[in-house]
Amino acid sequence: MAQNNMNRGLNSRHISMIAIGGAIGTGLFVATGSVISQAGPGGAILAYLIIGVMLYFLMSSIGELATFYPVSGSFSSYSTRFVDSSLGFTMGWLYWAIWLLVTSVDIIISSSVIYYWDFFQFFSPVTWSIIFLAILFLLNIFSVKAFGETEFWLSLIKVATIIIFIAIGVLTIIGILGGKTYGLGNYVTGEAPFVGGISGFLGVLLVAGFSVGGTEVVAVTAGESSNPSHSMPKAIKQVFWRILLFYVLSIAVISAIIPYTDPLLLNKSESVSQSPFTIVFDRVGIAFAASVINAVILTSLLSAANSGIYTTSRMLFSMAEDKQAPKFLGKLNKTTKLPLVSLFVTFIIVLFIIIIAQFKSDIVFSLLNIIGSLVIVVWASSIVAQIRLRSAIKKQNLNPDEVLPYKAPFYPLGPIIVIIALLFLFIGNSIGAILAGDMSVLIRNLSPMIILAIIYFVHKLIRQTKIVKLKDIDLKEHDYN
């Protein structure tokens, strides 16, 4: 079982921003236009409100686990301790693979984004990718606080941009800026507020569900939180409300200023010049809007990559502690208490992927598309672990109030809502392919699940693991001092 002897240098301020930074990225700044175009302003807002409810209960469940067992292994360690070590092995390597690809792709895209400015074209894209990777690696090897501070300020840039955007948008809607009063007329233009029927809404709901992926990284930071029983619940509450408000209010502003029928909203090229944020700033009269949004997108990508390097290295370290990865990956530096070996291995693998992408970029991006959606499996494993934890408390005749530092509200209703939502996201991701009769897409969506099941059962067969009995689950609170 992971003991986690790392330096606990992250406080509530860091943890809140790390989670916010994980969920706010190019999906908000670039993709929201197509969401509004597909489902209309009402459909888009409703979709994010529904996903917001799921996110609240999901993060509450993760918070309950993270405060009771605050280790960097998070989802791998929860499954190992409360369910089955084979499930922990599978979830650990899955989450590691997801973030490894996300990190690599974000760094690769960053090198393309910086090419927006002619001034930075003196290096090739691959050179910029290596420079970005080297900078992020250096930020992670000195102290966990350096990582936390970097992530705090990178995320703060995104948050500040959104707040300024919402404020300028509201002033534009009521006619103070931009020389025109927009009001709420675009909410009822054409077929608005709800467009595209049930299929349009369900499609947007899927986009909304996957767009909040990354918020769960907050669980990994629990292993280096200075006071997880205090900082984790606080961060989770703040993250839910801030992410919900940022997404919903941004969509509300965009919908009021740009009608859903505007072809620019589709932004099929995913160009920064056609980002809904850029369009709104342009209509207000901010000439350098595209440069501003491009800079924010660049910081978003680097912020996500920074979190990715942190997350992948901590997963390797924790799995090594749980004897689910090579032992040498579990070494800590005596001075900094950082898993430098795991960090260096992460650096080498990401560098290798970046180089491979120069010759076979389609393979890297296809892999990310295939396994990236499997983050919902990781979310589901945390719900299963929470249910097992609560069941063990009941089985051992203990009081949840005395065992748990933080209790997720509305249990068991919360986990039930999350399970229903996750089932929908999983089924909905393939239902379009079924209706269209596209077997290749269906196979692409289902094959990762089959591979995961094979990994789980092969590990179970080789290691002869068993599901932990409820009466045998260790319910002693983790001593993080």
Task: Name every feature range the model reports, one short phrase each.
Residues 6-7, 12, 20, 31-129, ...:
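Extracellular loop-to-transmembrane helix junctions
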Residues 157-189, 253-261, 379-397, 427-434, ...:
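Hydrophobic alpha-helical segments and their helix-loop junctions in multi-pass secondary transporters
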Residues 1-3, 76-82, 86, 107-129, ...:
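Helix-loop-helix connectors at the membrane interface of multi-pass transporters/channels
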Residues 154, 329-336, 379-434, 466, ...:
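C-terminal membrane-solvent junction of multi-pass transporters and transport-like membrane proteins
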Residues 10, 14-29, 190-253, 257, ...:
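Hydrophobic, membrane-embedded alpha-helices of multi-pass small-molecule transporters
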Residues 77, 84, 116-120, 188-191, ...:
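TM-loop-TM module centered on a large, flexible mid-protein loop between adjacent transmembrane helices
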Residues 1-33, 37-42, 55-60, 72, ...:
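Membrane-interface "cap" regions at the ends of multi-pass membrane proteins
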Residues 125-182, 236-240, 244, 368-381, ...:
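Membrane-interface loop-to-helix entry segments
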